[in-house]
Structure formats: C-alpha cells, structure tokens
C-alpha cells in the first residue's frame, strides 16, 4: 500500500497529462481511466523486482513508467531520457508541480548520453521504445554490474526477440515485462 500523497500525485499527474495531451499529443491515453491503467501498469513490477536506488528511463514520453515509479519510490533517483522537446517540457513541468526532487530530465537521445555523467545505475526501464536487443546494446554501459533491465513490452516482444527466454518475462494481460540481470546478458 502506498502513502496517501502518492494517490494525490497520481491524480495531479493524470489531470496534467490529459490537459497537455489535448494540445501536444504526448500519449495514447485519452481518459483518466486509461491514465490510471497506465499508472497501474507502471507500478505492477514493483511487486517482484529487486529494490533499487537509481533508475534511468529511456524514451520517457508522457511519463510512463518513470513518473509513477518516482512517485512511489521517492528515495530512489530517476533520470528520464526524452529527446523530444514537447515531451521533455511536460516532464519537467510535472516534476516541478509534484516537487519530485528525485527526478531529472535529460532532453537527449540515449545514443548521446555521456557515460561519464550517467553510470553505475541499478535499473534501466523503457516502455515500447525500440527493439529490446538494440535498447540493451545502447544502454548496458550505464548499468552497474549488479544492475537490471526492466522493459515494458507488448505482445510483439516474442517476434521482436525470439532468442530471449520467456523465463525472463512475466505477463499481465497484454503486457510483457522483461526483467533481466546485467550479468546474464
């Protein structure tokens, strides 16, 4: 169970996302119900993943999964990689509104992030951004040796990456969560 303040933050986040989405098309979510489902989807892996203190979310878009995770885990530090200006501006706005002092936005592509500035992370997340193998190849240098990837993928994940073991995945409805230790890559 999360503290009451988290639910207030989720509501503010959802309202702001829908407001911005009307103008800037940040996400496919068009109702508060779909935003709340996306929030639940973002938080679901907290049930079974190892605890973490640092996380990079690649292709943060409208804030899923990073903003809900940052709200739920205020003791962890989050770096959001989002190169598109309208989305990085939205993320910066919501961080200020919610006073998420544990989050920073980097308006840059993952290919251009300097390793000297971002490294030794516990967790890297991404939701439906690119092919899993390509994403892992581009970002594994940022993980610590005991770090993990948590990729939020759709049902095409199995076609996208047939060599990746299904034992490394867990599912909920049409979502596949790929959770992999960096030493096993």
Curated annotation (Swiss-Prot):
The keyword S-adenosyl-L-methionine appears for this protein: yes
InterPro entries for this protein: rRNA_ssu_MeTfrase_G (IPR003682), SAM-dependent_MTases_sf (IPR029063)
Enzymatic reactions: guanosine(527) in 16S rRNA + S-adenosyl-L-methionine = N(7)-methylguanosine(527) in 16S rRNA + S-adenosyl-L-homocysteine
Location in or out of the cell: Cytoplasm
Keywords, in A-Z order: Cytoplasm, Methyltransferase, rRNA processing, S-adenosyl-L-methionine, Transferase
Enzyme class: transferase
Enzyme Commission no: 2.1.1.170
The keyword Transferase belongs to this UniProt entry's keyword annotation: yes
Binding site for S-adenosyl-L-methionine: 59, 64, 110-111, 127
One GO term describing the cellular component: cytosol
Residues that span the membrane, as ranges: none
HAMAP family for the chain: 16SrRNA_methyltr_G
Stated role: Specifically methylates the N7 position of guanine in position 527 of 16S rRNA.
Family the UniProt entry places it in: Belongs to the methyltransferase superfamily. RNA methyltransferase RsmG family.
Classification via PANTHER family: S-ADENOSYL-L-METHIONINE-DEPENDENT METHYLTRANSFERASES SUPERFAMILY PROTEIN
Name of the protein in its database record: Ribosomal RNA small subunit methyltransferase G
Species name: Helicobacter hepaticus (strain ATCC 51449 / 3B1)
